[in-house]
């Protein structure tokens, strides 16, 4: 069984991060979302419509859900970047003027220099090829954009660039985004909600704050947490009164400054500890 009793709802406009150990079912899950795989039981709904109620209309749903696989640049095949980005819109039966608009719009979203559109994609760097591949999906203007490790193999700068561009695309278009990633930092920085897969099931599905506040459970599932979360958990272990749900650097800085203000005002930053003998609280 690739997936077992998986049930969840994604609201329009959500940015959902999907995390899980290798073999947890992440990739299988996302290939069901545009009809590449058909569930053996259960149903998938998009806008309240059963994806497989009328199998002959599955192509229509595939245009609604854009899927970007890992290393999508390996799927490039056209003579020029322009033609590659235009491939999807052309298959949708759009006229040339609309195709041209979409190609340039998508290239702009991913930060691709217009001067590169008439170049062969195979002459470009790995990061630029990745942009062309992602733009080819964006040009179809899917209602739902699903990305499987879109920053895999890129250097830190390239990683930040492409994920920032996806986030900006999400903000400007209101497109629902599902991002599969092994990077807890990326999920913490870009997602609004997190779906945690474990052993083919959903282990958690909640806001970013609430999921990373359950760090011990994530660690028990063989997953990591953002480095900044580990630091704050260590501070709490040492008896320092700081929150446990810190998951981004800006939030960490804010919490540190607040703690400094409390200390400067004479407030104790020492967590109360439980006296095992008396069963009550004792100050360290």
What do the PLM-derived regions correspond to, one by one?
Residues 145-148:
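Catalytic Walker B motif of ABC-type/P-loop ATPase nucleotide-binding domains
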Residues 141:
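Conserved catalytic motifs of ABC-family nucleotide-binding domains
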Residues 120-124, 128:
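Conserved ABC ATPase signature
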Residues 43-60:
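ABC ATPase NBD Q-loop/coupling interface
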Residues 34:
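Helix-to-loop junction immediately C-terminal to a conserved catalytic motif
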Residues 97-115:
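Conserved ABC ATPase "signature" region
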